[in-house]
């Protein structure tokens, strides 16, 4: 891993991340937002974490299979997530932003803060050090946090999964998922300039409209105003 330089915030490309518990509907909402952005003639890239690039996808498979628990627990998982993020940011996200694309990412460092930090008991010093090495001062332009009651989210995830075995995180006890929801709500409250908390316990189209309003007010309209004044 190498030290990252800050992303040039004046680029037309924007970085939007989606966070939330299991079954919150992140994948669906990313797809719907991508369609709207493309309709607005904005080049869009959809990706995910862990994963998104070939190296990160290989690490994803190991993580979801539970390798972190086998080789050292939460600290080991945090290191693996950092390695995946380093590859993902360096080979996919940064080049896309440099091309002026809008990048929509299913999970980013807030998930590490929630899963491995608050709930996995990884020290804040370690997480901050890993974040500085992997992304430096880079931050999403907007983080959409989808909030849904835990029982409803897990039921949705079970329907989506079908007969497949629950992954490493889906199989955690319900108290884990309740704690996860609370951590994401805390992040939204602590960083309102970056985060928007969206009630995801509604029809997908209604949730998509709420997200679009946030994107329009926070990113699209300021960008257009800046272009006119330039």
Swiss-Prot record:
Phosphorylation of dTMP to form dTDP in both de novo and salvage pathways of dTTP synthesis. It comes from the Bacteria. Belongs to the thymidylate kinase family. It catalyses: dTMP + ATP = dTDP + ADP. Signal peptide: none annotated. The gene is tmk. GO terms for cellular component: cytosol. It comes from Rhodopseudomonas palustris (strain ATCC BAA-98 / CGA009). The lineage of its organism: Bacteria, Pseudomonadati, Pseudomonadota, Alphaproteobacteria, Hyphomicrobiales. Keywords: ATP-binding, Kinase, Nucleotide biosynthesis, Nucleotide-binding, Transferase. This is Thymidylate kinase.
